[in-house]
Each structure stands twice: as structure tokens, then as C-alpha cells.
Amino acid sequence: MREETAEQPAPLRSGLTTGSCATATSLAAARLLLEGSNADAVQIILPKGKQVQMRLEFCRHTADGAEAGTIKDAGDDPDVTHGALLYSRVRLTPEPGIRFIAGQGVGTVTRPGLVLAVGEPAINPIPRRMIGEHLQRLAEERAYPGGFEVTVNVEGGAELALKTMNPRLGILGGLSILGTSGIVRPFSCAAYIASIHQGIDVAKTNGYLHIAACTGNASEDTMRRVYELPEIALIEMGDFVGAVLKHLRKVPVDKLSLCGGFGKISKLAAGHMDLHSRHSSIDLSQLAQWAADAGADPALQQAIRQANTSQQALAMASAAGVALGDAVCRHALDFARSVVPPQVQVEVFAIDRQGGIVGHAGGFQ
């Protein structure tokens, strides 16, 4: 009998960014106008020099130019734009250069603090550069002296944008056209981390020097209740507390409130920068030691070590009058302070599932 072996998981598949899609569709439409060539695929060069071929859904003339579309393939990354139709409309202009327009489903910047000026379409700098380089190369090949007007569209983008951080960042009406390498790495969460950085930038640029970084909706509600902070000062960090703390080295604010569920704050207290269960776990033995430091007797310490969850450990400590929540927040505070610049005042809140505060450490002068 043949011995069975465990099936090896297939490697995760990378995808292409919305910036790559916009580049490919803009190039295809421009080629149709300058060369008359109607293709079902187009090849582009990514920022690091890799060449990729992208399939087109259509490439056709319009009343005053041409348009081409492709389906966004994010590979195995859980990207909100995966499967969306992205299409670019190109019009030739007598003046050299490229003018970008936010079409259907692409947002417009309405707040200062982002890399793009207020009023600009939310097509980020590297996608703009990619599109510009490809169209300039085409213009030189065809000895075309004029310029291009490029309108980028994402079908259903306005609805998809509501699932992103764009409304909070002041990018209204649709999605952002993103990408730095042109490639989407599965589960890299690069776009989410970038939105955290942008949220901090926008808050500071608009004069909000006290921000609250929260792991979810319940912690945001807690911070609204405690401080009445506006939405622009609330940073939805999810599990990526490291993205907040490290960015504050470059863009410091005066005051930082960190708020999250007790379990996630316990991970922060243990020195974890990524609070997702894939990357960090709750150390019940460590919780027992912190409980001991807060006055827990040996029996309670042992019970905490054997607890099923951090919430159960917290409940047992609370019943015994041991302030485990505060102890955990103090350790989380110490770790956060070790990362951010010394001028940033920090405090930490831990909450239960109902949003009640079960621990706090730190404060502001």
C-alpha cells in the first residue's frame, strides 16, 4: 500500500494593482488612437523593470477618443477591487503632457495632508508616473507632438470605496488608483497600512494633534465617548499597531490614545506589532505573571494559566479584585513608548466586548 503524504498547499498567487490596470488600459486606448491597433492584450513594464501582459476586456473608439478595459486580478489577496472592471478613456490633446481625470468610481481628494493636492483625482504618484512613461514612450515612437487626457474609471467603485478608508481620508466619490511596485502581494495588506499612514498625515495636516488609534468599531465608539474626537482624528488601525507606532517616528503628534480589546492589548503588552492571530497569540503564562505583580495569589495565577481565553482570565482576576486590565495596559504603554518619539504622549485603553473600559494606563499633561 502506498503511504499517504500530506498535500502541499499551492503557493499564493500574486496579482496586479489598480495602477497597473490603469497603465495597461491607458496604453491600449492610446495605441488605438495613434496606431490604429486594436489588441486583446497589452504588455506593460512595472516600476522594477518586470514586463507583464494583461488581457483586455475591450478596446474601442469613443466619440472623441478611445477606451480600453481590464478586469482587476488581485491574485490570492483579499482585495476589495478584485474582479472589478477598470477602464481608461483617452483623448488626444494639442498641448503636450498628461491630464488626469477621475472618472466613474474613482475618488477626488477633498482634504489636505495626502500626497495629492485637494481637487486632484485619487490616482497616486507611481501609477501617474507609470501611465506617463508608457504614453510618453508611445508618443516618441509615433512622433506624436501632442498630449493625452486620461480618465480612469472603476465600475462600481463608488460603492466599493465605502468598504475602504477613503471616506475618512477625505477621498470622496470612489476608489484610489494605487500601487508602488505594480504587483499585489497576497496578504501583504500594503494598501491597508498605507491608509493608516495617510490617516495620521491627514489628521495632523488638518490640525488634529490628538489621535486615537483603534482596533475596531467598539474601540472607536469608546474613544468618541471619552474624548468626543471627530472621525478625522480616529485611526482605524485594525491589527496593525506597528504601522501607527512606526509612522509616528516620521510624523509625530502630541497625543496618542491606543484602544483595543483586552486580548489585543495583551499582545501589544507582550511586544507584538501585528495583533492578528496569524502572527501573534496571547500568552496566558505572561498574563498570570502580570496578575501576580498586581496581587494575584498562587491559586488565581494557576487558574489564569489554565484559562480558555484572555477574557476568562480577565473575569477571574476582576472577581478577585486584581486589576489585571490596568497591569496589561501599563506593559502595553511601556512598549508603545519604546517605539514612538519621546515627545509623543501615549495612553492605552483596554475594553471588553461591550466597549466598557477594563484597563487604562498613561495620560496627558
Curated annotation (Swiss-Prot):
Record-listed E.C. numbers: 2.1.1.195
Keywords for this protein: Cobalamin biosynthesis, Methyltransferase, S-adenosyl-L-methionine, Transferase
MF GO annotations: cobalt-precorrin-5B C1-methyltransferase activity
Catalysis: reaction(s): Co-precorrin-5B + S-adenosyl-L-methionine = Co-precorrin-6A + S-adenosyl-L-homocysteine
GO biological process, one term: methylation
SUPFAM superfamilies, per the entry: CbiD-like (SSF111342)
Enzyme class of the recorded protein, top EC level: transferase
Pathway: Cofactor biosynthesis; adenosylcobalamin biosynthesis; cob(II)yrinate a,c-diamide from sirohydrochlorin (anaerobic route): step 6/10
Family: Belongs to the CbiD family.
Protein name in UniProt: Cobalt-precorrin-5B C(1)-methyltransferase
Organism, scientific name: Pseudomonas fluorescens (strain ATCC BAA-477 / NRRL B-23932 / Pf-5)
Name of the gene encoding the protein in the UniProt record: cbiD
